[in-house]
């Protein structure tokens, strides 16, 4: 992480500047970022408002290992957080970048476009899709969010039947979006980092797209949302010969005798086709 610290970065009005020099508009999450507006954050130990040291280190390892170009596919990209951070880090190393994101909320897509442009990332260097990542093509119902920057954890309804779609239309509660597979989004190109944060459907996505993952993806970084999913993902990927590089378990609280997620977990796996990194 220290290798990527932007020592020359300075604070700018109206944005929060992080340790990579990435500028983040405060309006993407006003309840947290308004108070930090115009500041430059320090090194994130143990973390910052966005992620902890485990996720930062896991993601940056993929940039460190890249040679002449860098491609990230962020599934559930929100405001383009990992696209922006890894894109800036890769460009600082002189790498050609290709940033691919899919997100269910259109307002978050607009935030992502703004954040990427604010950080000098040009239109030909990124691809954003308003849709839902899935194991197969079809339709999903995505909740209409009240202030998406302040509401996370929205779960789509995958492949709903006609009655469910009709009820959602009548209630005005969801928007209908296309489902995209990994192959749809990547166009068959190799991926340095697949970042998956899709609120509980991460296991289905990984299993359903694993043929493409096994041939295209060098590393997969997963934000987990239950201990069950962590264990199931670990078993599946380890059984396929993938190497575990980061394991920071989800933190749960006990609510009425049931675990409730408080902090997402972090898993990083390396493809068996990739050599062990040299530090």
Curated annotation (Swiss-Prot):
GO biological process: methylation
Keywords of the record: Methyltransferase, Plasmid, Transferase
EC number in record: 2.1.1.-
Keyword match Transferase: yes
InterPro entries noted in UniProt: FkbM_mtfrase, SAM-dependent_MTases_sf
Keyword Nucleus attached: no
GO molecular function ontology, one term from the record: methyltransferase activity
Protein name per Swiss-Prot or TrEMBL: Putative methyltransferase Jann_4284
Residue pairs linked by disulfide bridges in the UniProt entry: none
Natural source organism: Jannaschia sp. (strain CCS1)
Record Pfam families: Methyltransf_21 (PF05050)
């Amino acid at each position: 992480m220290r290798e990527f610290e932007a020592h020359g970065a300075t604070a700018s009005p109206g944005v929060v500047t992080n340790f990579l020099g990435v500028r983040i508009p405060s309006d993407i999450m006003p309840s947290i970022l308004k108070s930090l507006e115009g500041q430059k954050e320090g090194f994130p130990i143990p973390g910052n408002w966005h992620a902890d040291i485990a996720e930062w280190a896991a993601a940056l390892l993929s940039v460190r290992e890249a040679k002449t170009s860098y491609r990230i596919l962020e599934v559930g990209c929100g405001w383009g957080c990992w696209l922006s951070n890894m894109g800036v880090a890769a460009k600082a190393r002189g790498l050609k970048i290709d940033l691919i994101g899919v997100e269910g909320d259109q307002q978050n897509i607009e935030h992502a476009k703004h954040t990427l442009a604010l950080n000098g990332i040009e239109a030909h260097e990124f691809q954003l899709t308003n849709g839902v990542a899935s194991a197969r093509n079809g339709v999903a119902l995505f909740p209409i969010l009240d202030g998406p920057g302040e509401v996370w954890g929205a779960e789509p309804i995958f492949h709903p039947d006609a009655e469910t779609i009709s009820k959602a239309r009548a209630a005005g509660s969801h928007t209908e979006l296309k489902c995209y597979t990994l192959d749809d989004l990547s166009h068959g190109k190799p991926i340095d980092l697949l970042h998956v944060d899709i609120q509980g459907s991460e296991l289905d996505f990984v299993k359903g797209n694993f043929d493409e993952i096994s041939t295209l993806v060098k590393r997969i970084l997963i934000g987990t949302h239950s201990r069950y999913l962590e264990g199931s993902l670990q078993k599946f990927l380890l059984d396929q010969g993938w190497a575990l590089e980061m394991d920071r378990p989800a933190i749960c609280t006990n609510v009425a005798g049931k675990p409730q997620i408080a902090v997402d977990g972090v898993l990083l796996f390396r493809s068996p086709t990739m050599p062990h990194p040299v530090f």
